[in-house]
From Swiss-Prot:
Keyword Secreted: yes
GO cellular component, one term: extracellular region
Compartmental location: Secreted
Superkingdom assignment: Eukaryota
BP terms from Gene Ontology: neuropeptide signaling pathway
Function summary: Myoactive.
In-chain residues carrying the UniProt-annotated modification Methionine amide: M8
Keywords, in A-Z order: Amidation, Neuropeptide, Secreted
Protein name listed in UniProt: Pyrokinin-3
Family: Belongs to the pyrokinin family.
Amino acid sequence: DPPFAPRM
């Protein structure tokens, strides 16, 4: 996952 899209 990219650092600007945190997983929920």
